[in-house]
Amino acid sequence: FASDMLSINLITSAIAYILFFAALAIPKLAGYRTLMLLFSTTIILSTIGVEWLYNIYEEYQYITIRSFIFQIISVVMLFTCVKSEDDYMIYALTMVISSVGSNIMNFIRARKYVKFKLRISKKLRIHLKPMSYIFLLDVYLVMDRSMLGYITGDDTEVGLYAAAIKIASVLTSFFSALYAVIRPRVAYMMERDEEQAENLNDLTARLILLFNIPMAIGMFCLSRQVLHLFAGSKYLGVTSTMQVLMLNVIVATFNSFLINQLFIIHRKDRWASMGVVIGAVTNVCLNALTIPVYGKFGAAASTVAAELAI
């Protein structure tokens, strides 16, 4: 299984690099080529990092300590090396550093569990169906920013929207970590004790209700203060957009639970993929209607509507 997963990831990484280098030829991106090349290292690094292997073996202590160490290194570099707006390449490097260190350490340590063999076999097809959902989800998650930039042609508008998205993602990442911890155990228990698996699902749902809604409401009420604290006064114009995205946090978190911890584990991959497709189509249609009129606010509202459609 591990060799199959690594083989698939290497194939998809190769395809990603082909598309990436084709994108570098676009004249509009000429000024960002060096920056894009730097960030492109994360494609191969995330592949050889085999983070999924450590989730399977529930090595959460190792994941936490490793992530903490490299994040500290990244933050120290950020505050000591980045002095002005002209240091954006150094800033990008500090973001990549944590990924480089974590993934290289993962790959070296993975030999403790498995011996990887690159191979292309008929068994790979078994994994393609559930992985298609992940691909669709990744495309869906960047659709709003891509369309906002394409329709408005305003980098400032996209930057403001990205700041709001980044702050909102802090909340969703909390629950993503929760799913990463519980999901392997639920999948394991489904084959041995279905009642225990359902109890874990019930616990997850209760934790979402306990933390998700209060956190989103609190951030909704304090959006202006949070933006001023973490992004600066220049970003206060995105306050209403961020408040809309807090509504999206509530809906998206429940969707993620339903899809990743219920549909996928119960082998309802088709339902998961269908939901993402419906959300993507809804998002594209509404973005086309709202972004020309409302800009970033329209993109945020369309994202909420798309999550509700899912």
Pin down the residues of each PLM region:
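Helix-loop junctions and terminal segments of transmembrane helices
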Residues: 1-7, 168-212, 259-265
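Hydrophobic transmembrane helix module of multi-pass membrane transport proteins
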Residues: 8-136, 142
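Transmembrane helical elements of multi-pass membrane transporters/channels
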Residues: 70, 88-106, 110, 118-188, ...
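Interfacial segments at transmembrane-helix termini and the short loops linking adjacent helices
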Residues: 24-39, 155, 219-254
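Residues that define the loop-to-transmembrane-helix transition and helix capping
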Residues: 3, 33, 61, 88-89, ...
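Helix-loop interface residues and adjacent transmembrane-helix termini in multi-pass membrane transporters
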Residues: 29, 56-57, 84-85, 151-155, ...
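Short runs within selected transmembrane alpha-helices of multi-pass transporters and secretion channels
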Residues: 38-55, 66-74, 91-107, 133, ...
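Membrane-embedded alpha-helical segments of multi-pass transporters/permeases
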Residues: 17-25, 75-80, 103-111, 146, ...
